[in-house]
Design a protein with these regions (language model features):
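Non-heme Fe(II)/2-oxoglutarate
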Residues: 2-96, 101-113
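Catalytic core of non-heme Fe(II) oxygenases with the double-stranded beta-helix
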Residues: 100-166
Length: 166
């Protein structure tokens, strides 16, 4: 992360006040680097576990996850702060997190993730690399949705099976 133990790093956080507590942060380059380096070592094919129409979706090994957790932990702390603000209430007991799944999607043109849900209490998405042509295409998009390469979050009171894969 950083070489200096006491060095404070400023992280900009955007919050979205609807449904669940949703935040947006930009991760540090060293975290991004370790995620990419470890993803290149992935051998487990995750396609059978995921909703994506993506040719390459791979799971991180336990060894890789052990390397990644120290980089991820500070962001869980940031989320905790935001969640307490969102609830307008301090935790009675600080939550403990278990990383039950971690994978990387290597998404190419014309591949996509359809609407789907994730199990567990907390879920996150990290964009490790966005091609410049896609950034340009998104910037030029005139519609009302998130546009090319964007991400959309849906929330509702219905059960998990409200998303159909038929």
């Amino acid at each position: 992360m950083t070489d200096k133990k006491d060095e404070k790093v400023k992280v900009e956080v955007a919050t979205y006040n609807w449904g669940p507590c949703l935040i947006k942060v930009k991760i540090l380059d060293d975290f991004k680097k370790v995620l990419l380096e470890e993803a290149k070592k992935n051998e487990e094919d995750y396609r059978g576990k995921l909703a994506g129409q993506i040719r390459k979706e791979t799971g991180y090994s336990d060894k890789s996850r052990d390397k990644i957790i120290p980089y991820l932990s500070p962001y869980l702390g940031i989320y905790d702060q935001c969640f307490q603000r969102y609830q307008n209430k301090k935790y009675d007991k600080k939550p403990e997190y278990a990383l039950t799944a971690l994978w990387c999607n290597f998404q190419r043109p014309n591949e996509f993730n359809p609407p789907h849900d994730h199990d567990g209490k907390l879920s996150f998405v990290i964009y490790l690399s966005i091609p410049d042509p896609l950034k340009k295409e998104n910037a030029e998009y005139k519609g009302r949705s998130c546009g090319p390469g964007g991400i959309q979050f849906m929330w509702g009171e219905g059960p998990r099976d409200c998303v159909s894969y038929q």
